[in-house]
Amino acid sequence: MISINNFINGEFVPPNSNQYLDVYEPATGLIYSNVADSNSNDIENAYQSAQSAFKFWSGISVEERAGYLNKIADGIESRLDEFAEYESRDTGKPISLAKSVDIPRAVSNFRFFAEFGLSFQFESELNSDQSQNKLIRSPLGVVGCISPWNLPLYLFTWKIAPALIAGNTVVAKPSEITPYTAFKLSEICRDAGFPVGVLNIIHGQGRTSGNALVCHRGIKAISFTGGTATGKLITKKTASSFKKLSLEMGGKNPAVIFADCDYDNMLETMVRSSFSNQGQICLCSSRILVEEPIYEKFKIDFVQGVSELKIGDPSKEGTQFGALSSKGHYEKVLSYMEIAKQEGGKVLVGGNQIKINGRCETGWFVEPTIIEGLNNSCRTNQEEIFGPIVTLQSIQSEYEAIQLANETEYGLSATIWTEDKEKANRISSQIDAGIIWVNCWLVRDLRTPFGGMKQSGMGREGGDEALRFFTEPKNICTTQ
């Protein structure tokens, strides 16, 4: 059994407490590793390492930093299948998904920001008859990056890459539930000759090491992806220190389907957008609003499509639907299935746990579940479940679609299905969500801003927005 240690100053270091947490394989429910249970002393050591490396890292050119990021990308890509196996084992997601999405996206994150940093305006000028103004965007210093368990390497690198290309040094904390690919990223950094101290990876629980990172006075910014409740705690804990915050949090995303849509494309995409990664993506559709003329047809076809998903061992190439990522989350999802039934919901398909024969017999599997007949104000339609449970509602008009879509405290994403471009534009402009997909889902141009409205987030990631977040502007004004 491998013990996952912290990565500080280019070396693997056991936690100050000498305590470790069990790491489980969701597909079997069995322990396969353990990970450092770090505390504030480990965070302090990582901070000191990052602080010592900051002068060097911020002092080299963007081109040099880009070269280092590309080396990391090359290292991950050269071991893509290996990383995919680790990600699948850690999370319970199908290995085909890890191979086609998670690990390639991690590679893309480093390569994108390596290239994007070369064109970003870290220096510019604004001149007039009265003055010359030199505008400089400088790195903040040591920053903290906290990533979730559902897309471990995908979102870990999404935060680290822009922080690094901007010239910051980083103390990063992955989820203790799914730490393995972050650990392997440490190996890539070491083997690629990445400058010591520039990236430090600390493992452990949110209430201990995560809290210490958030509260550390030397950390200039926190980039966080996770639940809204945790995001609120981070906001409170950092209020007095005025840290910069980027918070990407929960969602309860509507999909609005009109009768004039490209039906076949919509149907195939809705199965994927509802149940990809077992519904454990913040952008998954969870409230499906269908125009009345096609509601019954869609219901029948959607249930059929979901019923055909291949559920099973995530390590098998043919599996389309794997295990939930932790026992606690498995129990939470099962509890919401019961809540939906108690609220009067009619289960069209699913609604139960699953026993998989063979090595996965004790794994954390539930059925993909579709429910209709619920009021929009009920808990099932208002609270983020973050699992394979979706609800169906019939709509009569654009007005009703917009009203129901916005009737939630979240505002992360939405999808709209119609061949009428004017209708799509009308509705998009009135739905409160940070990203809206029209006739598609999860299509991402990494130059565009990403983040949510309302309780779904604060700040934006991606492209210019990410590099603005990880830099501080300064104006140097000289008179003629």
Positions of predicted regions on the chain:
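Glycine-rich loop-to-alpha-helix module at the N-terminal edge of alpha/beta enzyme cores
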Residues: 32-120, 130
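ALDH superfamily catalytic-core signature
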Residues: 221, 229-375, 438
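Hydrophobic face of amphipathic alpha-helices that form TPR/SEL1-like repeat modules
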Residues: 1-27
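Conserved C-terminal structural/oligomerization subdomain of aldehyde/semialdehyde dehydrogenase
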Residues: 28-34, 219, 256, 310, ...
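Structural signal for hydrophobic packing residues in well-ordered secondary-structure cores
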Residues: 54, 58, 73-80, 84, ...
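Rossmann-like NAD(P) dinucleotide-binding subdomain of oxidoreductase/dehydrogenase enzymes
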Residues: 122-265, 395
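Residue-level signal for inorganic ion chemistry
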Residues: 29, 65, 87, 110, ...
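Short, well-ordered beta-strand elements within core beta-sheets of diverse protein domains
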Residues: 32-38, 53-59, 145, 255-258, ...
